[in-house]
A protein has these predicted regions:
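Conserved ATP-binding TGD loop and adjacent catalytic N/P-domain core of P-type ATPases
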Residues: 1-128
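Membrane-embedded transport module
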Residues: 100, 105-187
Length: 187
């Protein structure tokens, strides 16, 4: 297959995210290396038969790598299933789309970097929100239960506890809304 027009920018965007890009292809080594050099791809694994792709993914995982596989065909389905994150191109086959963890709606390679950015940001926000909730509960519940009443005279009245719980929920929702900043700017 010929490289898509946005492929060099997509590889650069993945590099900016700290991702090592590997081309896993059935093409011959010389052709694959030529295309990889044009696109800035880090590693090439060429001459791989369709049934061997998932074994190559498993070998990368055995080396301690977290692997995201992008594919669109029937031949890619086992590798998409083997990968830590399977990413199907939306214009791909039904089996690839069914097997993947993420389905890109367009056939634009730049969307891979966008999906990874949104995924990483979502995990970061989940951890932050969990931290807010645990922190709030670790402080507010003992106070509301009157644990500090004998020693410090500190206790929350029920209506103040309910109000502060609402405030905690508002902080969590506002923090989650910051995910919108991760979307790429329209061009």
């Amino acid at each position: 297959d010929a490289a898509r027009e946005t492929a060099p920018a997509a590889v650069a965007a993945l590099h900016d995210l700290g991702v090592r890009v590997v081309m896993l292809t059935g093409d011959n080594q010389a052709t694959a290396e030529r295309i990889a050099a044009q696109l800035g791809i880090d590693d090439v694994i060429a001459g791989v038969l369709p049934e061997g792709k998932s074994a190559q993914i498993a070998a990368l995982q055995k080396d301690g790598r977290v692997v995201a596989m992008v594919g669109d065909g029937v031949n890619d389905a086992p590798a998409l299933a083997q990968a830590d994150v399977g990413i199907a191109i939306g214009a791909g086959t039904d089996v690839a789309i069914e097997t993947a963890d993420v389905v890109l709606m367009r056939s634009d390679p730049l969307d891979v970097a966008t999906a990874l950015t949104i995924g990483r940001g979502t995990l970061r926000k989940m951890r932050q929100n969990l931290g807010w909730a645990v922190g709030y509960n670790a402080i507010a519940l003992p106070i509301a239960a009157g644990v500090f009443m004998p020693a410090f005279g500190l206790m929350l009245r029920p209506e103040i506890a309910a109000l502060s719980m609402s405030g905690s929920s508002i902080i969590v929702v506002a923090n989650a809304l910051l995910l919108k900043r991760l979307l790429p700017k329209p061009q």
